A protein has these predicted regions:
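AMP-binding/adenylate-forming catalytic core of the ANL superfamily
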Residues: 116, 124, 135-138, 316, ...
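Conserved AMP-binding A3 loop
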Residues: 59-61, 216, 225-249
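Gly/Ser/Thr-rich phosphate-binding loop
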Residues: 175-179, 189-190, 194, 313-317, ...
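Structural core segment of the AMP-binding/adenylate-forming
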Residues: 104-203
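Conserved C-terminal "lid"/linker of ANL adenylate-forming enzymes
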Residues: 505-510, 520-522, 543-618
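Conserved ATP/PPi-binding loop(s) of AMP-dependent carboxylate-activating enzymes
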Residues: 399-403, 415-446, 451, 467, ...
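Conserved AMP-binding/adenylate-forming
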Residues: 53-58, 71-119, 270-272
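Conserved AMP-binding/adenylation subdomain of ANL enzymes
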Residues: 248-266, 274-315, 329
Length: 618
């Protein structure tokens, strides 16, 4: 039976037997590769649009043809089943095409943050046994070019495919882009630099494979299809492998749910593909639903709403800051949102008042939806829990998507808690995460009533309706406005490595300009700092202990600094983090203004306070 017809049958079966929904879905998980799944979902709408970039649009028929052409290209490169190909790419049509092309031939796409530093790049390429690299031209210059000797001599990687924005643009638009931005042909410039490394561009990649015979990898149960990454407890992104079932299951859950996507035709794809929420929850879900994905390779928090209004995309998955920016600027007072059919946020929280204000704005500006929230984990390939904004209890993040099941556990007794009691969320899905990879145990599971559950590390409670309420993260990590996770202990250790620092505390504050959390630091200076300008000290710490730290990102930079004589402590002689969080900011702080986009940090400014107490240095 055709997949989409079977999905409709299962929806009716679940409606008639809601208490058995988990087992019904568990016994009917689609058996396709990622490539096979989107091909099956779209075989009857090949004339509909699949991708858009600038003025260039591709139908699903053209999209699948391109996947097949690129698959031939990788076969001609010598890429085989099981090979791992590192992708260092922003959201471009080529990025999506390449992912499915690799999946078609049974190779594994290893999606790495293109802003990763040199040492972290080496770490990923070696640890994850990469066989070849595909990277954006700008990323080649910043991250790959300097380690060419290493990747060939140490890792035996001898193939690098380079993509460019102009590869995706129509001829005239491509020429205009080259004129405006002085686009250089990196492929020509480096192709003979290292005789042992084959560096080439898309045109040669496709031309050299015109007569290549391509093998389509058949579906094999529990075969790893892709690798993404997420920050671990040390702040170092950890490897998250996913099977075809893991990736397809997210789309399957949405398709089998009661969410109506029939009016959604276009999806603004801004969440990055190296993260599961951009890969499974956005890219693969969108194509499984037959939507036109509008690819946005580079954006900033300041222009994301402008992009939404310009493209008139029907659907946007984003962070809370996107939507707070919409209601926080007078420039959008007259915005017409009549095109918006689905709006979703994750990676952070909104207060009940903030959510009400956003929904009031959406309704008054003609949007066809309310803002929907949910909860998920990268380890589960994204969303696990999703709300119906028209029916949910205020403050809830929703109920289980079909095929998911969560229970609240007391971590001390390991007993399930009653409704309304706080505990650790343990979660299970019809397609659970890969628990062991390359000989390493990634997750420990516990068996409860015949199902395997994983500790999410998040504190929640659940009501009698099955709705979940997120209360915090057990690890105490800070979730920035853009969803990036900061680990206070790791950041404190980095800053206190400076001889100018005696002690520090890291907390968070609400950043009104970004509509979300940002890191706040309390600093006690050491004797070595005497006589040195405070701006020089801060610059030294940022440059030498954060930006130069291989386990940190520019996103770890505290944007508010308080220099104090002593840190607050509780009566139990423990640092009082609760107090500094409650105190927040008062204008006496030194501000770090970071000029950043999703592709990296351009520069930062140190701004001294204009009011408050005079800073005292030891």
């Amino acid at each position: 039976m055709e997949l989409l017809k079977r999905i409709e049958e299962l929806k009716r079966e679940i409606l008639n037997n809601p208490s058995d929904s988990f087992d019904i879905i568990l016994n009917n998980i689609p058996k396709y590769t990622m490539y096979g799944y989107i091909r099956e979902c779209n075989k009857n709408n090949l004339d509909r649009y699949a991708l858009r970039f600038g003025r260039k649009r591709y139908t699903y028929g053209e999209f699948i043809d391109l996947i097949d052409r690129y698959a031939k290209g990788f076969a001609a490169m010598g890429i085989r089943k099981g090979d791992r190909v590192a992708l260092l790419l922003p959201n471009l049509p080529e990025s999506t095409i390449i992912i499915y092309a690799l999946n078609k031939i049974g190779a594994i796409s290893d999606n790495i943050d293109p802003t990763s530093k040199e040492d972290r790049m080496k770490y990923f390429l070696e640890k994850e046994k990469v066989n070849a690299i595909v990277c954006f031209d700008k990323v080649y210059e910043t991250s790959i070019k300097s380690i060419e000797n290493y990747i060939y001599n140490e890792l035996n990687i001898d193939k690098v495919l380079i993509t460019k924005i102009t590869d995706s643009l129509p001829m005239i638009e491509s020429a205009m882009y080259r004129m405006k931005y002085r686009d250089e042909n990196i492929v020509k410039r480096v192709s003979t630099s290292y005789g042992n490394i084959n560096i080439f561009g898309i045109n040669r990649f496709l031309n050299d494979s015109r007569y290549q015979v391509c093998y389509t990898n058949p579906y094999v149960e529990n075969e790893v299809a892709t690798i993404c990454h997420s920050s671990g407890t040390t702040g170092v992104p950890k490897t998250i492998p996913s099977t075809n079932e893991n990736v397809n299951f997210i789309a399957f859950q949405h398709q089998i749910s009661n969410i109506d996507y029939s009016r959604v035709k276009t999806f603004l794809h801004v969440l990055p593909g190296f993260a599961q929420f951009g890969f499974s929850d956005s890219m693969h879900l969108g194509h499984s639903l037959g939507l036109e994905m509008i690819e946005i390779p580079i954006f900033s928090q300041e222009n994301i709403i402008d992009i939404l209004l310009k493209t008139k995309a029907n659907c946007l998955f984003g962070t809370p800051s996107f939507w707070l920016r919409l209601i926080g600027s007078d420039k959008y007072n007259n915005a017409d949102l009549s095109f918006l059919e689905e709006a979703v946020y994750g990676g952070g929280t909104l207060t009940i008042t903030q959510l009400a204000n956003i929904n009031r704005f959406l309704i008054s500006h003609n949007a066809k939806c309310l803002l929907r929230t949910g909860y998920g984990m990268s380890e589960f390939n994204g969303t696990c829990i999703l709300e119906d904004p028209f029916m949910s209890t205020p403050g809830s993040c929703g109920i289980d998507l079909p095929g998911g099941s969560g229970i609240i556990i007391n971590p001390d007794t390991m007993k399930e808690l009653s409704c309304g009691e706080l505990g650790h969320l343990y979660y299970s899905k019809g397609s659970n995460p890969v628990c062991e990879f390359d000989g390493e145990v990634l997750h420990k599971t516990i068996n409860i009533d015949g199902r395997e559950y994983i500790d999410t590390g998040d504190i929640m409670k659940k009501n009698a309706r099955g709705e979940y309420f997120f209360e915090g993260r057990a690890s105490g990590m800070i979730s920035r406005y853009d969803g990036y996770k900061i680990y206070p202990n790791a950041l404190e250790n980095a800053v206190t490595s400076s001889s100018y620092v005696e002690d520090v505390m890291i907390s968070e504050y609400y950043d009104e300009s970004n509509f979300g959390a940002m890191p706040l630091i309390y600093v006690v200076l050491s004797k070595e700092s005497k006589g040195i300008d405070i701006k020089d000290i801060i610059k030294n710490i940022i440059d030498n202990y954060i930006l130069s730290n291989n386990n940190m990102s520019f996103r770890d930079i505290p944007t508010k600094w308080k220099v104090v004589d002593e840190l607050p402590y509780t009566t139990a002689l423990k640092k009082d983090y609760k107090k500094i969080k409650e105190n927040g900011i008062d204008g006496s702080e030194i501000s770090i203004v970071c000029h950043e986009t999703n592709m990296g940090l351009d520069y930062y400014d140190i701004v001294m306070p204009t009011k408050g107490k005079k800073l005292i240095k030891k």
